[in-house]
Amino acid sequence: MRWLITGAAGMLGRELVRRLAENEEDVAALGHDHLDVTRPSAVRAALAEHRPGIVVNCAAYTAVDDAETDEAAAALLNAEAPRLLAEGLRPHRRHGLVHLSTDYVFPGDARTPYAEDHPTAPRSAYGRTKRDGEQAVLTALPTATVLRTAWLYGRTGRSFVRTMIEREARGGAIDVVADQRGQPTWTGDLADRIIAVGRHPGVHGILHATNAGSATWYDLAQEVFRLLDADPGRVRPTTGAAFRRPAPRPAYSVLGHDRWRGTGLAPLRDWRSALREAFPDILAAEHPPTRRGAA
């Protein structure tokens, strides 16, 4: 089976392609330079050329604040492009689609984890476009799988974890938001779960693909400092109001994982366990070894 990965140059896309290659899977890895998923003719041509057994859509507009002033651009990539992919795959019933979505489709005012079937009510332009993308995919291709995830970090790309590593190296104290709660999620675990879903063609609909447990940004920053053998007391709690941004951030965006029970697949493990395993690779990517004889 051939896998076609859109957004293959992004943080999640790179990790997914790497793990598929390690498993000796047949992969067509297409970044934006190779496939503009917003162009109908380009999508049709890519599907015809590569003839994938499954498509994983990692392409997304993720500039949450910029979307507030350019919702049309966000909608093009987050809603229209997924629709094009789903419609392109619809005539080929044996071909599957895994589409990545976000916790931002919920309002973020709950006190218990959001179930997969909880009504969506996004409060940001970014969240609205991702909600519209989910609906477009499942309308055009009911056999598709939508995986909602959140708070991603990985060995490459920008993330909160990498930012905390850099801030710790500068020394001194740092103020971190302690009144927003979510689920830090490692791209390695998410990539493994995407592969598992792709190999189980009976898994359809919406699933929540975040690492288990929950944390505030403050909790996550302290854990990063501990893994660096630094004093977590240097991380000071503050409120989200101290960092004013154009787009509202969810105060509570913990996702429930109940639907995994009916799939035969396990949900992702606890976020602390995942972070501990991922950390050496993140540090290695942050400070790659110098080749002998290199200038």
Swiss-Prot record:
Q: Which gene encodes it?
A: oleU
Which superkingdom does the taxonomy of this entry point to? Bacteria
GO biological process annotation, one example: antibiotic biosynthetic process
Name the residues that bind NADPH.
Answer: M11, L12, D36, V37, A60, Y61, T62, Y126, K130
Specify the protein name: Probable dTDP-4,6-dihydroxy-2-methyloxan-3-one 4-ketoreductase
Q: Which residues bind NADH?
A: G10, M11, L12, D36, V37, A60, Y61, T62, Y126, K130
Q: Which family does it belong to?
A: Belongs to the dTDP-4-dehydrorhamnose reductase family.
* Source lineage: Bacteria, Bacillati, Actinomycetota, Actinomycetes, Kitasatosporales
What pathway is this protein said to act in by its record? Antibiotic biosynthesis
Which species is this record about?
Streptomyces antibioticus
Q: Which PANTHER family match?
A: DTDP-4-DEHYDRORHAMNOSE REDUCTASE, METHIONINE ADENOSYLTRANSFERASE 2 SUBUNIT BETA
Function, please? Involved in the biosynthesis of one of the two 2,6-deoxysugars, dTDP-L-oleandrose, attached to the macrolactone ring oleandolide to produce the aglycone antibiotic oleandomycin. Probably catalyzes the reduction of dTDP-4-keto-2,6-dideoxy-beta-L-galactose to yield dTDP-L-olivose.
**What cofactor does this protein call for?**
Mg(2+)
* Bound cofactor: record note: Binds 1 Mg(2+) ion per monomer.
